[in-house]
From Swiss-Prot:
Gene name of this polypeptide: KIF3A
Basic and acidic residues bias (residue ranges): 410-424
Keywords: ATP-binding, Cell projection, Cilium, Cilium biogenesis/degradation, Coiled coil, Cytoplasm, Cytoskeleton, Microtubule, Motor protein, Nucleotide-binding, Phosphoprotein
Name of the protein this chain belongs to: Kinesin-like protein KIF3A
Organism: Pongo abelii (Sumatran orangutan)
Keyword Transferase: no
Ranges of Acidic residues composition bias in the record: 376-400
Residue stretches of biased makeup (Basic residues): 675-690
Amino acid sequence: MPINKSEKPESCDNVKVVVRCRPLNEREKSMCYKQAVSVDEMRGTITVHKTDSSNEPPKTFTFDTVFGPESKQLDVYNLTARPIIDSVLEGYNGTIFAYGQTGTGKTFTMEGVRAIPELRGIIPNSFAHIFGHIAKAEGDTRFLVRVSYLEIYNEEVRDLLGKDQTQRLEVKERPDVGVYIKDLSAYVVNNADDMDRIMTLGHKNRSVGATNMNEHSSRSHAIFTITIECSEKGIDGNMHVRMGKLHLVDLAGSERQAKTGATGQRLKEATKINLSLSTLGNVISALVDGKSTHVPYRNSKLTRLLQDSLGGNSKTMMCANIGPADYNYDETISTLRYANRAKNIKNKARINEDPKDALLRQFQKEIEELKKKLEEGEEISGSDISGSEEDDDEEGEIGEDGEKRKKRRDQAGKKKVSPDKMIEMQAKIDEERKALETKLDMEEEERNKARAELEKREKDLLKAQQEHQSLLEKLSALEKKVIVGGVDLLAKAEEQEKLLEESNMELEERRKRAEQLRRELEEKEQERLDIEEKYTSLQEEAQGKTKKLKKVWTMLMAAKSEMADLQQEHQGEIEGLLENIRQLSRELRLQMLIIDNFIPRDYQEMIENYVHWNEDIGEWQLKCVAYTGNNMRKQTPVPDKKEKDPFEVDLSHVYLAYTEESLRQSLMKLERPRTSKGKARPKTGRRKRSAKPETVIDSLLQ
């Protein structure tokens, strides 16, 4: 039962963080790499130790839930994803995303092997869970489920379900809706099989590639969004709509070029992937740091889309995937540190009741209107159906209340026709046509007139039938989109839902048993400590103190090692930021050099006054650019070539092209200047030419 609008609870929860460690793969076994990760599922700890000869103590991290190499897909789903999806079905926003180094099993955790029920990942299992909940809902509850699928490839948002996957989409933001993707396609689904087909279609369009660390490496971040709208009657007697959004995110893995061997396009992709993941880490750090006043959500498309999921209106679960090999020791430690930091992010989730962008209420309204039209029947004028001439006599009536009389006449001339009535009218038309053919005493003109009248009535009847059928089809299509609670929609997903339920019950029993064992273990440890405190001699006391001292010394060395690693990591981040600043400074100086040498200062100031930064597309834009340059030149009238410009200068003798023919013509046309009286100069002033102009030109050209 939904709550009143005035009572919207706000759930303040931390981001749930779980860690999953995959087993050693065949390549790592063939290279004889050792296992450096130990998983204690009962205590929820991950211990990483160096396998070389160094005396560095192992590092231990504690999380909400941890999964070892032998963990099952169903267990991962029931312990981590099920609570999030239950919250989404109640109207909250939810986000589940996998984070970690490339090749650690993020895509397997999120998608799995869909052909095998036991190996399906979080996304396919959520399909059966959602429609299983709808099938168990009350009969007066209405649901609308729609999905969308996008990827972020090289910092470009692409629609994996659209016709053109290379088209770049824009990220927009509205106060009432929040961050959204403009022109992103969404499809209404009726069962889990529809969802699975759409996901398969989008997965085929996703960018993948091979590297040295992963044969099927994801080269983009993918976000599969499920929007669930639910309409039911509230305590005030009115229908309320709740809308929950579930974002299922499969992130591309962070890479080191030396290990992946990425070159060319793969290297460019890796650079963009690392940049967005670095921004994600900066966002996590800023949210955890209480002194930070700015969270850099806008520095990356990924963090912009996950803005609500990290520190906003969402219940979020982060699954950090790690590899067990000592070869990936540094990457494993980095992933665990980020995950450990993300535990402290606080989200404020609330139920989305009666949102403005809900489609369920709009569909229900259209269905009611269509049902009303079908019950009342199509309105066809009386003259079109009966062919009576009463309306013809009334058409000439004009009075002071002519408009009202016309309206009454129109209402009286309209009839409501049901499907049964249409059948009767069709039969009547057929009878009249037969009777018309049997009457031989009618004149040809009357016969043609009667036949035309019958054809007109038949056309009107056919049109009414087509409109009725169109309304039925439209109503059927809308009713298919709106799912009624309590209807069995599982179909093939019924087996998967059964597996999930059995696994959930088994997990409950195991959880109770683990809790009991944990309490017993704590009691045993407390008893051991009490026994150790009771010394019978000074020698035993010295041994006990020495053991405690060694334990404290180990903890001290671990803390120092952790501090040294953090300082080294911090120094690396500072050096990376400084290198970015130096690169940006070089690019800025180059741009300023070009601008100062090619654009006058006055025009620079004019451009600066009319330029603004577009946050949505990440580019500078000029105001009123539609009224400048080529856009205005297209509208400039072309002058008439016949009218000669009085100020036009004759440039016919100028050498526009230095060819032999043009040079010869220019010299032949050139005339000697005349005196002021208009008389030619005396012949004595001329010199005798030794050669013809053609020969001079030829010699010059040679």
